[in-house]
From Swiss-Prot:
PANTHER family: HEMOGLOBIN FAMILY MEMBER, HEMOGLOBIN SUBUNIT ALPHA
GO biological process: hydrogen peroxide catabolic process
Any single GO CC term annotated in Swiss-Prot or TrEMBL for this entry: hemoglobin complex
Classification via SUPFAM superfamilies: Globin-like (SSF46458)
Family: Belongs to the globin family.
Positions bound to O2: H59
Cross-referenced InterPro entries: Globin, Globin-like_sf, Globin/Proto, Hemoglobin_a-typ, Hemoglobin_oxygen_transport
UniProt keyword annotations, A-Z: Heme, Iron, Metal-binding, Oxygen transport, Transport
Identification of the protein by name: Hemoglobin subunit alpha-2
Limits of the Globin domain: 2-142
Cited function: Involved in oxygen transport from the lung to the various peripheral tissues.
Length: 142
């Protein structure tokens, strides 16, 4: 999905705020995904799935760190996430349908914590960005 200059501006404006507390926001998004879509827990057999668990927060930070890395390479998301794509496709074999579920919960979390910044333009840009990241992460499945 092609990101416009305006999309990139909005992504770069909000991602540092999210990345500053990646464990909190990433953990919240994961917790919501696990709660709403229990089948996504399959890949985390030893996790404590309670709200604010250290395991969910730590993995949430990894998710947000990866998104921040992708945001630093908006003109080459595929290149910046190639190793992560390989990991999810070949080693972890994550169901590709899980990425849009997590993307949705990231949007919900950002909207909750950043209502002033999450205007329609930022919503559109972040949605396109997360769709692009999801596409890259599932590209090796084909």
């Amino acid at each position: 999905m092609l990101l416009t200059a305006d999309d990139k501006k909005h992504i770069k404006a909000i991602l540092p705020s999210i990345a500053a507390h990646g464990d909190k926001f990433g953990g919240e998004a994961l917790y919501r995904m696990f709660l709403i879509n229990p089948k996504t827990k399959t890949y985390f057999p030893n996790f404590d799935f309670h709200h604010n668990s250290k395991q969910i927060s730590a993995h949430g930070k990894k998710v947000v760190d990866a998104l921040n890395e992708a945001a630093n390479h908006l003109d080459n998301i595929a290149g910046s996430m190639s190793k992560l794509s390989d990991l999810h496709a070949y080693d972890l074999r994550v169901d590709p349908g899980n990425f849009p579920l997590l993307a949705h919960n990231i949007l919900v979390t950002v909207a909750m914590y950043f209502p002033q910044q999450f205007d329609p333009h930022t919503h559109k840009a972040l949605d396109k960005f997360l769709a692009s990241v999801s596409s890259v992460l599932t590209s090796k499945y084909r």
